[in-house]
UniProtKB/Swiss-Prot annotation:
Phosphoserine, modified sites: 282, 396, 581
GO molecular function, one term: RNA polymerase II cis-regulatory region sequence-specific DNA binding
Swiss-Prot/TrEMBL GO biological process terms: cellular response to leukemia inhibitory factor; mitotic spindle assembly
Function: Transcription factor involved in the regulation of cell survival, proliferation, and differentiation. Transactivates the expression of the CLU gene.
GO cellular component assignments: cytosol; Myb complex; nucleoplasm; nucleus
Protein's name in the database: Myb-related protein B
Gene3D superfamilies in alphabetical order: Homeodomain-like (1.10.10.60)
Keywords noted in UniProt: DNA-binding, Isopeptide bond, Nucleus, Phosphoprotein, Repeat, Transcription, Transcription regulation, Ubl conjugation
InterPro entries recorded: C-myb_C, Homeodomain-like_sf, Myb_dom, MYB_TF, SANT/Myb
PROSITE patterns in UniProt: HTH_MYB (PS51294)
Entry-annotated residues carrying Phosphothreonine: 267, 443, 447, 490, 497, 524
Organism (species): Mus musculus
Subcellular location: Nucleus
Annotated region (Disordered), positions in chain: 325-412, 603-626
């Protein structure tokens, strides 16, 4: 929770009626907040008529009294009021005046401080200037005390602050709203450790409340109880499962089991001092207010004067024995109406337990009157210990013992060992029959289950390869069709044979197979493509990257060009130092590929000479005739057959290109930098370069 700024507090105070604690004329007052128009009207009236006659000023307001107008002016609207931060001189003045007048005369102290009110001086002293106020960090013990006290007292910060010496009510409230409340709401508040002592609150009760009974402090369900004058007699009984186990073991050994009766438990009485205090408290002659102790479990215990420390020492000496409910039992005799009234009980000692166990065994050996036993679930006690309210314990009488000493146990205790159903990997019919027979042989549950119209095993079957392929490549239909095959079979147990027994040593396990395989694993869509087009053939890595890219580009262009690499082998040879890298060759070949095609087309359209030298053959020049050898590829022949069409198309396009018009003198002047401004800029550039040339070395631009 973020703290509010000073301006927000002043704005709220500006429009708030803060004179609600005045005692006079309470019926005729208007408790509505002052509006902005009323404040402006009051300022104007005070400037005009002064502060002498407040009744006359209040007559201008329909529902405001003279005291309200005066209070509003003096506490809120007075321009002489100082509402800013305190200075060191003001703090020192307040400390001196408190030493002189005490901490009660705040109105008198405020008269010595110009522009300050008594309320401001009081809050400044109690929150900041008081030397007893702690300004250190909050400890975990203080947080725990605030949390426990807030459960009982609520937002009564003044009373909570009395439990924390050195902390003010305002500091406690701010710490709760900013830190502890968030931790409690989110469950992040640390749980109470065993070493922490319980919190005790001292509350004073008036005399009139003594005869009416003590009420809960904060209405939060705190349990109010008086000190038990007579300790109740309780009995302990073992749980149901222990009874059944003891009965079965006794039958096997041939002995009759002894009923679980631990006898009566005598609890220690409270101290005599507490008895006297309780009797004095209950007597009608007492008129003084008494102090009550509120323990961490929200129990109110009467205590007076010096005996309070004795009661606290008694509880603190053995908190486990006083607060552990696991050692407590129930009353032995039920009421006639069938209801059981719970009463406070006290723990027992180990020596008493041994003596009473001895007595119970003797009583069990001798026949005696029938005793009604009570059965109690252990979870009930644990739930009751967590509860903060007074509740009755639900108890139901157990079955009576017969003449033989033991009766039939209840149906809940007739438990059989669960039979394990082992299904062998056989046919579906036999497996389903054996599974149904084994299910019928089991002990029926309390709630019958209706047979299902379908087999649950259809959700557990694994898909085969055909189903996977159909889901990956479904058929394109207007209506989606489910291609999964419904197989109604009984699920069998998974084969849990170890891998070293299931697979021989000669075979390779799946994980070893994948670890030894160096080839990357192909995803399923690529596997489908490989099945369609055939497996990939590994090809050796070729160093002729340029030729491979040429083949790809020519195949995409839909034509085949004649490679003339064999024509000039000497020109292609270069010196070892000037050899280009394959990347530069590829870059250049990609850029000059189109120029290569145009040059070949132009060379094919040139007319053949009448006589060719004998050393030059058509095959060496790169041309092929239609009647050449069959060794030429079909693509080369197709290229030669399609030559006349391309030539005609090229001639048509060139014939339609118009001749460019000659440039005029004005165009040349503008385009070639002959205007005045261009010449001026050129001259300036030359001058700049001439200046820089003497001081800087020229660098040539290398374009490669």
């Amino acid at each position: 929770m973020s703290r509010r700024t000073r301006c927000e507090d002043l704005d709220e105070l500006h429009y708030q009626d803060v004179d609600s604690d005045l005692l006079e004329q309470r019926d005729n007052r208007c408790k509505v907040k002052w509006t902005h128009e009323e404040d402006e009207q009051l300022r104007a009236l005070v400037r005009q008529f002064g502060q002498q006659d407040w009744k006359f000023l209040a007559s201008h307001f329909p529902n405001r009294t003279d005291q309200q107008c005066q209070y509003r002016w003096l506490r809120v609207l007075n321009p002489d009021l100082v509402k800013g931060p305190w200075t060191k001189e003001e703090d020192q003045k307040v400390i001196e005046l408190v030493k002189k007048y005490g901490t009660k005369q705040w109105t008198l102290i405020a008269k010595h401080l110009k522009g300050r009110l008594g309320k401001q001086c009081r809050e400044r002293w109690h929150n900041h200037l008081n030397p007893e106020v702690k300004k250190s960090c909050w400890t975990e013990e203080e947080d725990r005390i605030i949390c426990e006290a807030h459960k009982v007292l609520g937002n009564r910060w003044a009373e909570i602050a009395k439990m924390l010496p050195g902390r003010t009510d305002n500091a406690v409230k701010n710490h709760w709203n900013s830190t502890i409340k968030r931790k409690v709401d989110t469950g992040g508040f640390p749980a109470e450790s065993r070493d922490c002592k319980p919190v005790y609150l001292l509350l004073e009760l008036e005399d009139k409340e003594q005869h009416q009974g003590v009420q809960p402090v904060d209405g939060q369900g705190s349990l109010v109880s008086s000190w038990p004058l007579v300790p109740s007699i309780v009995k302990e009984e073992s749980s149901e499962e222990e009874i059944a186990i003891a009965a079965t073991s006794a039958k096997e050994l041939g002995h009759e089991p002894v009923p679980a009766d631990l006898g009566e438990v005598r609890t220690p009485e409270p101290p005599e001092s507490l008895k006297r205090e309780y009797q004095e408290f209950s007597s009608p002659e007492t008129s003084l207010p008494y102090k009550w102790v509120v323990e961490a479990a929200n129990l109110l215990i009467p205590a007076v004067g010096s005996s309070l420390s004795e009661a606290l020492d008694l509880i603190e000496s053995d908190p486990d024995a006083w607060c552990d409910l696991s050692k407590f039992d129930l009353p032995e005799e039920p009421s006639t109406e069938g209801s059981v009234v719970s009463s406070p009980v006290q723990p027992q000692t180990s020596q008493q337990q041994q003596e009473e166990a001895l007595q119970s065994s003797q009583q069990a050996a001798t026949p005696g009157p029938s005793v009604t036993e009570y059965r109690l679930d252990g979870h009930t006690i644990s739930d009751l210990s967590r509860s903060s309210r007074g509740e009755l314990i639900p108890i139901s009488p157990s079955t009576e013992f017969g003449g033989s000493g033991i009766g039939t146990p209840p149906s809940v205790l007739k438990r059989q060992k669960k039979r394990r159903v082992a299904l062998s990997p056989v046919t579906e019919n036999s497996a389903s029959l054996s599974f149904l027979d084994s299910c019928n042989s089991l002990t029926p549950k309390s709630t019958p289950v209706k047979t299902l119209p379908f087999s649950p095993s259809q959700f557990l079957n694994f898909w085969n390869k055909q189903d996977t392929l159909e889901l990956e490549s479904p058929s394109l239909t207007s209506t989606p069709v489910c291609s999964q095959k419904v197989v109604v079979t009984t699920p069998l147990h998974r084969d849990k044979t170890p891998l070293h027994q299931k697979y021989p040593s000669s075979e390779v396990l799946p994980d070893q197979k994948y670890s030894m395989d160096n080839t990357p694993h192909t995803p399923t869509p690529f596997k489908n493509a490989l099945e369609k087009y055939g497996p990939l053939k590994p090809l050796p890595q070729t160093p002729h990257l340029e030729e491979d890219l040429k083949e790809v580009l020519r195949s995409e262009a839909g034509m085949e060009l004649i490679i003339e690499d064999d024509m000039r082998p000497e020109k292609q040879k270069r010196k070892p130092g000037l050899r280009r890298s394959p990347i530069k060759k590829v870059r250049k070949s990609l850029a000059l590929d189109i120029m290569d095609e145009d040059g070949k087309l132009m060379s094919s359209t040139m007319p053949k000479p009448l006589s060719l030298p004998t050393s030059v053959t058509p095959s060496s020049c790169g041309f092929t005739s239609p009647g050449s050898k069959e060794g030429n590829s079909l693509l080369n022949q197709g290229f030669l057959q399609a030559k006349p069409e391309k030539v005609v198309a090229a001639q048509k396009t060139r014939s339609h290109i118009p001749t460019p018009a000659p440039m005029t003198h004005a165009w040349k002047t503008v385009a070639c930098g002959g205007t005045k401004d261009q010449l001026f800029m050129q001259e300036k550039a030359r001058q700049l370069l001439s200046r820089l040339k003497s001081s800087h070395t020229s660098r040539t631009l290398i374009l490669s």
